[in-house]
Amino acid sequence: MYALRHAAFALAAAAFFAVAVHAQTAPAEPPAAPAPSPATPAGKTPTDAPSDASETQASDKDTKKSTQVVDKIEVNASQSTYDARQDDTATKIVVTSEEIKKYGDTQILDVMKRLPGVTVQNNSIRLRGLGNGYTQILIDGDRPPPGFSIDNLSPDLVDKIEIIRAATAEFSTQAVAGTVNIIMKKKFSVSKRDLNLGWYSGTGYTSKNLNFTVADSAGKLAYSIGGYGGAGTFGSPFRGDTIGVDATGVKILERVSTSVNDGGNQYVGLYSTLAWTLGGGDSFTMNPSLNAYRYNNKSNSRTIYVLGESTLYPISAGRNNGQGTNFGNNANWILKFKEGAKLDLKLNVNFGTRDNDSFSKSFSVDNVQTLERKTLDPSKDNRVSFAGKYSTPIVEGHALLAGWDVGLSRNAPSTILLETNVAAATINTTEDYTARVQKLAFFAQDEWNVMSNWSVYFGLRWEGIETRSSGTGLDVTKNRSSVASPLFQTLWKFPDKSGRQLRLALTRTYKAPDTYSLVPRVYRSTVNTSTAPDSQTGNASLKPELATGVDIAYEHFWEKGASMSISGSVRSLSDYNSRGTFFIGGRWVNKPINNGRATSRSIEFDAKFPLQVVLPQAPPIDFRFNIARNFSNVEEVPGPNNRLDQQTPLSGTFGMDYRMRGGMIVAGGSFTFKSGGDVRTSINQIRYATPKRDVEMYVLYKYTPKLQVRVRLANVLRQDTVTASTYFDAAGSTRFNSINPSQMNIGASVEIKF
């Protein structure tokens, strides 16, 4: 298969340019009305269905005026009755632009916190309590470029957000927990000139930021240009205690570690959308982006040995500096043909660089220098992909879609290490690595309305992956794997039109290692113990993690936006990716590994309703409630608590939002709970994380239609973060406990429209 990869690229490129020639030579004709889509409920027009992720929402100016009027009437009529969450066969929640802007949020992450089944933890978006690669994050159907931060994305530039709970063939099946697809606006009805200024102070961190948006149209061109920038300073104390016991339980080690870190960071970015409306309903869109960052950090640490022999490095001081840039561009060409057929072509390129350097010195208890270490870590990260899909309603009652996706990503890091150690020989090494991932995928899917209240979805996606790693002291390592993902989803509505319905989904998904996870770079720990080992970023032999899943849900929808759902899911995982600590070559090393089979089970309850549904004369307050219980176990790790690392076992959110009539004042708050406890990550290791409770509040005041102020409080309960790590074997155990103090976070922003 991989011997044909160059042919696949050539064929894809030929198809792209062949269609371009056809588009230039064929006369422009108004597109014919498409046949009804099976994903569209009975009695509705095809325009009721949501637009494609990358399709420009603009009428064709070459179409006759009378046709424009009819189209406008159809769209307006459908908007009042179509609900993607209730009507789509695929399990999908669509958050419209109106809902995104309803509460005046200035960051997409604030919008995400209100969405059913979504949790946000440390700026990471999670579904089913799983992040770290299990939840797929897409921008216009593509993975965001390296260095891109979603929290810098202005909600005003977002057309809608899709929460796809079960995988579909159209998108990559690298979505074990699900997919979050953020779709950007391609057309602006009015010109926009926005400026947002923000200030934020949190636990050991203070920042100032700004972002702006300029959007307008000129003839058949619609464009938007956005930018962001910011700077921050941080400084936080840290305390850790280490206790060691022998096989009989007698304490043989006790030490107390304290440290202070302080520094700062600066970042800046530009992103834009250029969308052309072409003849015959065609469109062409480009999304160039550029971002850059830099940071600096200084640290001082000291370890006091209460019991046990001191090492040569109880005192250390160091600095760490870094910078990076990334450039990317997405090109999207949509061509429409007769009878509703459509070809969608995408080309995506990204080029990124990172440069980090660190310098540290360590001293004995007598303040004699014992170690000096200097490390340089330059890296390059490049990606290119080309994808296409063809859809046609050629068969009545069916919506057929087929396509391909080819891609190449390459990561080339280097490590230059100079270490002078009084207890060992001087180290002066240069290590160069290269990791490459090639992907080839084909897919097809069909949606079918079997009856007026029953629809089904069939999909099949095949993805082949080849990884290649090489570098200093490392043999060339190649891994080839492929995943065939049959997918099935069905929706059945109760015939009494009560708003009740049932869903079922069967999926085959996977999580593939990225180029960063394949490069075995090692960052050396000064102390180097079983609880503070060297960190190896990657493993050249890492295999993809495969998952077979079943989802079932009962949903009930009422008028005025009230809804309730109960859902359950099971995921059976093989070649589960985790991290393990090993004693290799005289040093403790923590690295990623494949750790056998695992199973994850989840049950979730979600509800939201406006108070006016129950009390019509009540103030406009919206309530939302979500609780999720996640169970998991890893077969290769003995219990108890042998669950998936970083999965939240129990989480719950209760929130309310108030919007004054006219929208002058918007306010709200939420209480969030996330359980913690012990998790056994390997045969010899246990981690502990404290349960987290958080209260968050905000108020938005619209002084004028063009000026609004937003104030936000987070971490109101000021709960400290307590973590622990334990390593044990036949000789005894060592436990490291740490405490990070916490404080209330305060933020304020001013949004100005020109």
Model features per residue range: what roles?
Residues M451-V456, S563-L573, V589-G677:
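Gram-negative outer-membrane beta-barrel transporters
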Residues F673-D678, L700-F754:
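C-terminal beta-signal and adjacent terminal beta-strands/loops
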Residues G318, G322-G324, S379, E431-Q438, ...:
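Outer-membrane beta-barrel signature, preferentially recognizing the C-terminal barrel domain
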